Design a protein with these regions (language model features):
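Flexible, glycine/proline-enriched loop segments at strand-loop-helix junctions
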Residues: 104-105, 129-133, 160-163
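A cross-family phosphate/adenosyl-ligand binding-site feature
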Residues: 1-97, 135-170, 174, 180-193
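Glycine-rich phosphate/nucleotide-binding loop
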Residues: 104, 125-128, 136-141
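Alpha-helix capping at helix-to-loop junctions
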Residues: 110, 120-126, 148-151, 155, ...
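Active-site/ligand-binding-proximal alpha/beta "capping" segment
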Residues: 89-124, 131, 182-189
Length: 193
């Protein structure tokens, strides 16, 4: 794994543990020689992930829509900053530039990114690992929901296993490195989207 897309919130949460953890994620990836691909922002968890990686000498590739650059929320310290026109182009770039995906706490945009990475793997658009870091139980409800989808038959058990879940970053990264691809429903390329 050379680079991982990190999905996370751009907001500053009320509990500083989330910012501290985001900085830790960035720093740990840099120390492992893994580049960060992320939303290109300087605020919230996004900024903390980038800062942690940059402070540890890591590669940070931001992908941000023009509208957010114009709103002056872009992180100017990125190793590379890719400016795109649409959110779809942004998410496609995350897939194209990374070898896998890690979701840490965030809001609806983060959920959109996670669901897309998971559903694209399910459909065979990519075969990259999809990880969920459950910081202080933040995603307990989401995990229960995913399990419920599998229980009632809306998610095949083999596709439930696409989502690798852990509350410790190092063990999540180790599991992602040993990732075995689930059999997709279809076999497609991302150019067929």
């Amino acid at each position: 794994v050379k680079r991982l897309a990190i999905y996370c919130g751009s907001a500053t949460p009320s509990d500083p543990v989330y910012i501290e953890n985001a900085r830790f994620v960035g720093r740990t990836l840099a120390e492992r020689g893994i580049g960060v691909v992320y939303g290109g922002g300087r605020l919230g968890l996004m900024g903390a992930v980038a800062d942690g990686a940059l402070e540890a000498g890591g590669e940070v590739i931001g992908v941000i829509p023009t509208a957010l650059v114009n709103a002056e929320v872009a992180h100017r310290g990125c190793t590379e900053l890719h400016v795109v026109e649409t959110m779809h182009q942004r998410k496609q770039a995350f897939t194209d530039l990374s070898d896998g995906f890690v979701t840490i706490p965030g809001g609806t945009g983060t959920m959109d990114e996670l669901w897309e990475a998971m559903s694209w793997a399910q459909l065979g658009y990519h075969s990259k690992p999809v990880g969920l870091l459950n910081v202080t139980g933040y995603y307990d409800g989401l995990i229960a929901f995913v399990d419920k989808m599998a229980e009632v038959g809306f998610l095949r058990p083999m596709h439930r296993d696409i989502l690798l879940i852990d509350d410790q970053l190092d063990s999540l990264l180790d599991r992602m490195a040993g990732h075995k691809v689930a059999r997709p429903i279809f076999s497609m390329s991302s150019s067929e989207l």
